[in-house]
């Protein structure tokens, strides 16, 4: 019998791919994140694949969960974090998991955060009437809870910015009505508008 552990399984909705953590030999550290696949629901899982160094480290990677078939959430004490186990996200792009990024505050703390799961039920922010960017649950042993690991609910609301300014003619310093202004976001998004004085 194996003396290794296979823990924290997350099975995809189609039931053909499963993600899990294991300390089987050949990994990068203690526990690594792996996936296994099968051709049909009645078949056994096989093709066990380590998710590689963008996800796994010499430390512990545990509690995998996929969202939208392209976002892997997991906990790690091997990536640079805030302390203990932090929750990280890695994007699946061209069949390759990208470098994991820390979810930062308020999700992570200097304590342990594990078991990120999203609530995909559609709902609107009562203030802005916009859809929430995300909401879900995770567990943490941070202070202020009721015991060991407590379950926390989170809501990530859309960021709403208000920008004001003026466009002046460089020579006359007169305000220009109807000038086109373009705002470009760090993600490549853009918004165009006209000045109105």
Can you annotate each of these PLM segments?
Residues 1-166, 170-180, 185, 190-194:
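Short, conserved micro-motifs composed of acidic
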